[in-house]
């Protein structure tokens, strides 16, 4: 069977830059699934994405589906005919579904009986006939949150569509996709190259688009070019470009023909905190800031034009003129804000609502101040500095700078606090209170910052759960999942001696009578333990290991982490599987028994050598392991408990637990309960698979 290259290109208006990659990847994944479901043999499916196009190129696509033999078994002969030999309704319905009559059906005889059978040779459908619907289906499944409709058409897509190119080899596949008749026409760059041209063969793509249309259709190629050219441009001025992955992706999604240029701004603006300048350059203008080797911001920036100009200096000057007013605004806000102390913004917090039922930002500040001080006392941080940081924590939200450049919250609080002469750990805490902001983000660097970050997040968790507005599905408007995971990461990775039970109770207490959910403490703890589950799954721990620890519901995060590591190590031991099975057996035996067990094992009642040996080892280990449990040495404890494998196996091989003798039965059940209690001091090992 011959093979050809297939090309589909959807030419559009400018696509959303932050969604461009996901649209292209989804298009490729959807179309690959369509090919596979149709049984069409194919080679690599390559995706292309530029601001005004999505495209796929499929190598070695078969020209038709393979022929196939199908068999459909019908009713058993006994049910297919009545006593007079006439076909039953079931047989006739089955035959009708196969497109035959009952008398045309074959019979299948096996050692289990005889059935009606339909066999057919189905010729594979041509690829040309299948492709239009496959493309349309793949586009319809794209993850588009908001669809557009344009003109008088009822067609919906992410942006208006102008061209649809469908080529199988050198042949146009006739189809109407998104209201556009397919053709071999491709549009080039808006201002360079040929605005429109035809493509003769799918194999010519994307080279023909580069040569005639001045468009680099390969997303990764554009991104790599921007990165390499920006690094070289920064090197030429003795600096290093801030090429964050997210901004690189966005810029690569904004240009079809990237041309990297270098510009500058007035050095006087460097007196403004670098974070505000960088926010303006990266967030508003999509520029790449440049840093000196010592990490200080240089008065330069790198940007990407979408055109090759005969006079690039004109483009550079234009961008310098655009950014200057924004930097001047930042300078003005910075100087204006410093005319009063950060603390002077406290009264204005009373005018901003945190949440209708939970009060204002000033109310939240008072709670954070108290909770940060309480946490500081628990973890050995400076209580006075923690309460001071709590008092000032939201003051920068009232400054001109943060009002205009919202992403500078926290960091501007730090700069203004330093200007006011606040303690350094207080100033740093104001910046780090929102950390970690995302997975893998840095944690607060000092104890005061840890106390403030935990207090801020716990106040939000307690308040929102306290009024019954916990996250539902994908909706999490107060970012409670991120807050919960942030608290857990700080406590675990900083090894802080905090208990979620008392921490949540204190956060709830500070709300007074504002909360309406009587189960708020348990709800918050359950939610946070659920975040533990997600965290450890991401870390590669097995679900049953997590469940084994969760079964004990440990509320000290650092303790939870120690148990996780202990159980994970226990699973590597030779005795693990046998002891997990034994624990499961013990758990089942105890669950089925309604006996009232004794507080201790009666040694004089023991009879069999195997139960005597096991009972003695349980007693010895109970005393030996008590310090291990107290000190959180769970891994050492489980290693010691692994030594019970042999006596436990011997016990179950030789000893009957549920004997008629009640005293003996209760004594053996008591011994098993004491055995299980030792393991439960760490985790429920019976849940391990």
UniProtKB/Swiss-Prot annotation:
Cellular compartment(s): Cytoplasm
EC number: 6.1.1.14
Gene Ontology terms for molecular function: arginine-tRNA ligase activity; ATP binding; glycine-tRNA ligase activity; tRNA binding
Keyword ATP-binding among record annotations: yes
Keywords, in A-Z order: Aminoacyl-tRNA synthetase, ATP-binding, Cytoplasm, Ligase, Nucleotide-binding, Protein biosynthesis
Main localisation: cytoplasm
UniProt KW Protein biosynthesis keyword: yes
Family matches, as InterPro entries: DALR_anticod-bd, Gly-tRNA-synth_bsu, Gly-tRNA-synth_heterodimer
Enzyme class: ligase
Annotated PROSITE patterns: AA_TRNA_LIGASE_II_GLYAB
GO biological process: arginyl-tRNA aminoacylation; glycyl-tRNA aminoacylation
Catalytic reaction equation(s): tRNA(Gly) + glycine + ATP = glycyl-tRNA(Gly) + AMP + diphosphate
GO cellular component terms given for this protein: cytosol; glycine-tRNA ligase complex
Superkingdom in the source lineage: Bacteria
Assembly behavior: Tetramer of two alpha and two beta subunits.
HAMAP family: Gly_tRNA_synth_beta (MF_00255)
Family as reported in the entry's similarity comment: Belongs to the class-II aminoacyl-tRNA synthetase family.
NCBIfam families: glyS (TIGR00211)
Protein name: Glycine--tRNA ligase beta subunit
